[in-house]
Amino acid sequence: MAGSVTVADLVKNTRLDVYHGADLLEKKDITTSDISRPGLALTGYFNYYPRERVQLLGKTETAYSKNMSHDERLMIFRKMCQLTTPAFVISTGLPVPEELVQAGEENGVPILGTKMTSSRILSNMTNYLEGKLAERQSVHGVLVDIYGLGVLITGDSGVGKSETALELVKRGHRLIADDRVDVYQQDEQTLVGEAPAILNHLLEIRGIGIIDVMNLFGAGAVRQDTDIDLIVHLENWTPDKQFDRLGNGEQNRKFFDVEVPEISIPVKTGRNLAIIIEAAAMNFRAESMGYDATKVFDDNLNKLIKTNSVHDSHK
């Protein structure tokens, strides 16, 4: 399920100024993350005018509009200000054309502005809207920021996910979501997880109930969202189940178009899962930086075998 965004949300999260139409912000919905630079529309070409997008006017567009007469500008801006148009944004602190204000008032389109350049505000708005409007998938698990890595802890109910997350928070790491994690794809290689609004900062511990992590441990113990870099799946230990002992059994889990590395950790009485998951996160970071402990072990083992073979051949 995709999220929903109003112009009011966009204004708040991208630090836009409201020039006209403040009473319309909550009523105007944004349905696409694409931002329009309406250069062709200013020339009068409206065959493919994307009226459902936020319209961004920069130096080029405003300079071109100055070459028109008052009546021409008013006619063009009236055509551009459609009922389905969420808003107009004027970048670089440029003055707002009076005709645009009039057309916006007539058709209920807010006029916004910023001192940021067109490139910067375009990037900010696109990134924000892509995150909020992306399709979401709910995952049963706990998401924790460990040493700057987003670790999604999954497993059957009762296996100890929340208790492990609590221990990780006590050890200085940060909770993002417990029980339910909303996951969305930010770009071709990035998966982001966040908590549903109703579960923000909350952790459920059997026997205690629901605790507010931010109130108990402070604002430094929580985060709003994080990239998901690693999945740790907790499984109850059974004698007949084979678990990876060398770290060379690579597994991935796919969400949308992104594959995330996954490791399975057996749960057994007496094992300190928080420390094990910390070690898994640090080992993953080391591997991403080019150091592979398993490969080093294999290389050393092969050298030892080769050395022993040479010695045996000389006997």
UniProtKB/Swiss-Prot annotation:
UniProt GO molecular function: ATP binding; magnesium ion binding; phosphorelay sensor kinase activity; protein serine/threonine kinase activity; protein serine/threonine/tyrosine kinase activity
Catalytic activity: [HPr protein]-L-serine + ATP = [HPr protein]-O-phospho-L-serine + ADP + H(+); [HPr protein]-O-phospho-L-serine + phosphate + H(+) = [HPr protein]-L-serine + diphosphate
EC primary class: transferase
Positions of region (Important for the catalytic mechanism of both phosphorylation and dephosphorylation): 203-212
Its EC number(s): 2.7.11.-, 2.7.4.-
Keyword set includes Glycoprotein: no
Region (Important for the catalytic mechanism of dephosphorylation) location: 266-271
Active site residues of this protein: 140, 161, 179, 245
Pfam family, one: Hpr_kinase_C
Domain of life: Bacteria
GO biological processes: regulation of carbohydrate metabolic process
Binding positions for Mg(2+) per the UniProt entry: 162, 204
Extent of the signal sequence: none
UniProt keyword annotation of Acetylation present: no
Cofactor(s) demanded: Mg(2+)
Keywords, alphabetical: ATP-binding, Carbohydrate metabolism, Kinase, Magnesium, Metal-binding, Multifunctional enzyme, Nucleotide-binding, Serine/threonine-protein kinase, Transferase
Binding site for ATP: 155-162
Function text: Catalyzes the ATP- as well as the pyrophosphate-dependent phosphorylation of a specific serine residue in HPr, a phosphocarrier protein of the phosphoenolpyruvate-dependent sugar phosphotransferase system (PTS). HprK/P also catalyzes the pyrophosphate-producing, inorganic phosphate-dependent dephosphorylation (phosphorolysis) of seryl-phosphorylated HPr (P-Ser-HPr).
Similarity comment: Belongs to the HPrK/P family.
PANTHER family noted in UniProt: HPR KINASE_PHOSPHORYLASE (PTHR30305:SF1), PROTEIN YJDM-RELATED (PTHR30305)
Domain notes: The Walker A ATP-binding motif also binds Pi and PPi.
Assembly behavior: Homohexamer.
Additional note from the record: Both phosphorylation and phosphorolysis are carried out by the same active site and suggest a common mechanism for both reactions.
Name by which UniProt lists this protein: HPr kinase/phosphorylase
